[in-house]
């Protein structure tokens, strides 16, 4: 028995001991909304747990897929027949209990737990289709990386989901590059989930132990905390920092420069969090995978740093780089940078966030990347 086999065996024994038995005899039904590389990866994780915990989770995990054709075949057909998302997560076998569904309402109608995992700019359209058509007792987890921003302030996407659908929503974020998680390379993540005010009782409703059982794997360790705002903001703002890290990497400035960007970015992230969400906990950013660990990982190899690097190396726009590099997927940092800048400018506090400001100016106003150190130094005078 290999070390990983032993780890699997011990993990399965522990999971069996803590498995919640629904007194109504109805395991929780799971739906994943989204089938990009991270959506497909999370579907793989929860489908594996559904198989191992049949008294707690329904054996079938539904995954909503935006239908498209790949080499003349529908993507849902490929996933359901070949058990592989050949476009967004190639060369990774998916569990056969994942069922790809092209209709969003059909995918979510009877779900007890809905996991949202789509580019955040598509969320309003998705929620409009689901409004009034989901189980009113369902719970949700947002894996989205972004904010709902207006000139008056910003809203967590988890709160936006709650307001639109009337169901409680937590958040998942961490140092999780999807290809590594999908290939079962060990990592950890943070799930923020508070017990809902209308909690119906242990075994009848989703509590923190159910959430941990749903996501925790021997290769994907889960810490469940209460700070939904902190986890959500970390997942969104780290992408802005990663864009800037990509700039300095593409310019060939080395690891010292990238570390400086990451340090300044972490400071601005915490300042932003406390400015708009007073109940955020600073330890979320410094102690959890969703905080500094996610910044490090995202700046080392995520799609946002790749886009920023390509912009610097090839002197192209962010959206050109996105098109070349991401195979139809979204670079969230491009959108979040604009949203954060517009909010801070409307509040007349943009100069308190020099890295966020400079990143916006580079992407959207053509500011030379080489001016980044000068702008950051001037802000400290």
UniProtKB/Swiss-Prot annotation:
UniProtKB keywords: NAD, Oxidoreductase
PROSITE patterns (UniProt xref): NAD_G3PDH
Catalytic activity: sn-glycerol 3-phosphate + NAD(+) = dihydroxyacetone phosphate + NADH + H(+)
Gene Ontology molecular function: any one: protein homodimerization activity
Region (Disordered): 1-27
Keyword Oxidoreductase annotated: yes
Protein name: Glycerol-3-phosphate dehydrogenase [NAD(+)]
Gene it is expressed from: GPD
């Amino acid at each position: 028995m290999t070390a990983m086999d032993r780890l699997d065996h011990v993990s399965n024994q522990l999971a069996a001991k803590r498995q919640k038995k629904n007194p109504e005899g109805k395991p929780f039904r799971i739906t994943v909304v989204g089938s990009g590389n991270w959506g497909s990866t999370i579907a793989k994780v929860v489908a594996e747990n559904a198989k191992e915990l049949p008294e707690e989770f329904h054996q079938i995990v539904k995954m909503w897929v935006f239908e498209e054709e790949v080499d003349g075949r529908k993507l849902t057909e490929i996933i359901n027949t070949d058990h592989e998302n050949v476009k967004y997560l190639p060369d990774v076998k998916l569990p056969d209990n994942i069922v790809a569904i092209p209709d969003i309402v059909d995918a979510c109608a009877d779900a007890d737990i809905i996991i949202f995992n789509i580019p955040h700019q598509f969320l309003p359209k998705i929620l409009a289709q689901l409004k009034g058509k989901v189980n009113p007792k369902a719970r949700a987890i947002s894996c989205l990386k972004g904010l709902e921003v207006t000139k008056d302030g910003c809203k967590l996407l988890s709160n936006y989901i709650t307001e639109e659908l009337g169901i409680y929503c937590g958040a998942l974020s961490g140092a999780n590059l999807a290809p590594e998680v999908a290939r079962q390379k060990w990592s950890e993540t943070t799930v923020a989930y508070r017990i809902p005010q209308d909690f119906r009782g242990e075994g009848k409703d989703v509590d923190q132990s159910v959430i941990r059982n749903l996501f925790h794997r021997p290769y994907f360790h889960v810490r469940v905390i209460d700070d939904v705002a902190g986890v959500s903001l970390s997942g969104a703002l780290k992408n802005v920092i990663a864009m800037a890290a990509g700039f300095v990497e593409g310019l060939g400035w080395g690891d010292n420069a990238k570390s400086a960007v990451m340090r300044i970015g972490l400071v601005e992230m915490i300042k932003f969090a406390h400015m708009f969400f007073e109940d955020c906990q600073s330890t979320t950013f410094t102690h959890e995978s969703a905080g500094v660990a996610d910044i490090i990982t995202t700046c080392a190899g995520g799609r946002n740093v790749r886009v920023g690097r390509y912009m610097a190396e090839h002197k192209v726009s962010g959206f050109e780089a996105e098109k070349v590099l991401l195979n139809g997927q979204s670079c969230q940092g491009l959108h979040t940078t604009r949203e954060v800048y517009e909010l801070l400018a409307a509040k007349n506090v943009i100069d308190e966030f020099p890295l966020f400001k400079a990143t916006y100016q580079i992407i959207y106003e053509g500011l030379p990347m080489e001016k980044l150190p000068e702008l950051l130094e001037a802000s400290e005078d």
